[in-house]
Amino acid sequence: MAVMLNSTVGVKLASTDISDHVSSATLSQIFDELEITSLGDTSHKFTKGLEASTLTLDFFNDFAASQITTLLQTNYGTTITAVLIPVKGTAVSATNPLYTVSILINNLTPISGDVASINSSSISFTCNSTVAYATTGTF
């Protein structure tokens, strides 16, 4: 089993590389569970429904032009493309796959923290598409 330090994840939103502002990224691939339990069954049975994935990003707010907070504010209420790769700077492959998904920018936290902390945000975005998994391509 290969074990890796998770410090090289690459994250792009709307083709802008925001990796240098992200402190944590979590892509949760989830499907709705549809119950199909019938009379006579001895346990619940489920089948896959629609995909309902989420992307959670923890990042440092930055209001400069073309930076993350401005990018999100500009796209607030719209759907943009998010691209993630486990090891940025390394070719896309079976051991370094590319994940692409459309996310709805439906919530923002542009101001957060207290007098002694960094202005940062932790936001979960609703995915508006299935998560595409690729072993070829470019980040």
Put a short name on every predicted segment.
Residues 7, 15, 25, 77-80, ...:
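Intrinsically disordered/low-complexity terminal segments and short unstructured peptides
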Residues 13, 68, 85-87, 125, ...:
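Extended hydrophobic/Leu-rich segments
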Residues 33-37, 86, 127:
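Single-stranded nucleic acid-binding surfaces, predominantly the OB-fold ssDNA-binding core
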Residues 60-65, 129-132:
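Acidic glycine-/aspartate-rich tracts in secreted/extracellular proteins
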Residues 66-106:
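Short, acidic/charged, Gly/Pro-enriched secondary-structure junctions
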